[in-house]
Structures are given as C-alpha cells and as structure tokens.
Amino acid sequence: MRYFSRRLALLVLPAMMLAGCDNQATTTSERGTLKISLADAPITFDAVNITFSEISAHINGQWITVRGQPMTVNLLEWNNGKSIVIGTSEVPAGHYTQIRLKIQDAEVVINGQTHPLEVPSGAQSGLKLAHEFTINAGSTYELVVDFDAQRSIVTTGPPNNPNGYKLNPTLRVVPKAMTGSISGIVTNPEHAAIAYAIAGIDTVTTTAVDKNSGYFMLAYLPVGTYTVALNDTIGRAFVKNDVNVVVGADQDLGMITLQ
C-alpha cells in the first residue's frame, strides 16, 4: 500500500532583505533572501547522511547560488515539523522557475553499520525541481520540497540480504503559505509507530512518532481532506478519515491509542 512510504522535506524560505550581493547586478531594493531548510526524515535507518555540494535557484536564464559550500546533514535529526537551514543567500526579486540541489555524497547507517548510498550522476550534477514562484520586493515567499525517502532509497541484491543501496530521488514541491499540519499524541508509541497523511490513494507525507512523548506532526500539507493512518512494528494501528487541513493551522487529533 502506498501509504507505507517515508518522506523527508526540504523547506525553501525566500525572505526579503535589503543588502548588497554579488550574484547579480541589481539594486538593494530589488533583492530578497532565499533560505533553504531541511525538515522531516526517513525512519527506517539509524542515520541518513547527505552531503549537499551546492543549492541554487533559477531566474532569467541563470542559476543563483544559495549555498556554494558542502554541508552534511543527518536527515534523521529533523522530524515532526523541525527544520535546519542548509542554504541562505540574498537573491534578485523576480520570477523563479526551478530549484537545483547538488548531492556530493550520501550514506546510510543500518543496525550500526555504515553503507555507502550510491548517488546517480544526475544528483551530482543537480536535481532540478520544477516549480514556478515569484519573490516580490519587500515580501516573503516559502516553498516546501518534500523528498520521499522510502521510494528514493532502494536496495540491490536479495530483498532479505541487500548488498547495496542507491539513491533514486522522488520529490514534490508545495508553497508553504498554502499548507497546514496534523498532529497528535500516541499513548503507546514504544514500537516505532509511524503516522501517514493520505489523500485518495496517495501518501502525501509521513513522519515517525516520538518514542518517548508519543507526539507526531504531519507538516507542510496542502489544503484538503486527508485520511490519517498510524501503525507500529507489532501490527497495532489507527485510522481516522476526513481530517480537514486549512491554511496556517494545525489540526490536533488529541490522544490516540493504537489497537
């Protein structure tokens, strides 16, 4: 079933700032700041370490660098709506068409063992995420890039004894201003519970339930109606239909017991 995918998200936060920059010859009143943060995480590994070598945005036929220095992030540290800034730079105000993420290196840690995560040449030269957006002078615009980790990390070799791991990126982009969230507290979260937001037959996002507090947040959801499903490793589950998400608000489901 498709709702058993895990996801992580990249949060793109362009915000207006008035200061000089060398990326393009524009006046300070024509510039903004593009900030890119990493949020949410896959939850089938001990760690997923991704090294980004460059992050950029496309405007008027050229790429504007948002981050030009390598940065390694353990994706598992960012979950339940938390995010980390992985790039920020002043950029020209105007109409953008793409975000580009260059991945230099990657590895996964499973049961304490570190395995290289094979990065395709396309990811090294740049994952281009097509999404048109405009940064207006004096305004703020935010994007969320949702990276489906479960479908993006594939194994090679026998299913029960894999001999390698490959990165096959699957991503989606949504404007943050048009999103909301769903949260709750699981009363019995000790067996690696997972929460899913499902629209129709498609899993929109997934998050791990905190093992100690039982808290979870399905963040950056487009406005709409969702089915919320939870399960754990011993087969207990919970399903709630017709959960409405509205702009800028969190839909709190309260206390949930898996059965």
Kindly label every feature range from the protein language model.
Residues D22-V243, V247-Q259:
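A short, solvent-exposed, low-complexity linear motif enriched for acidic/polar residues
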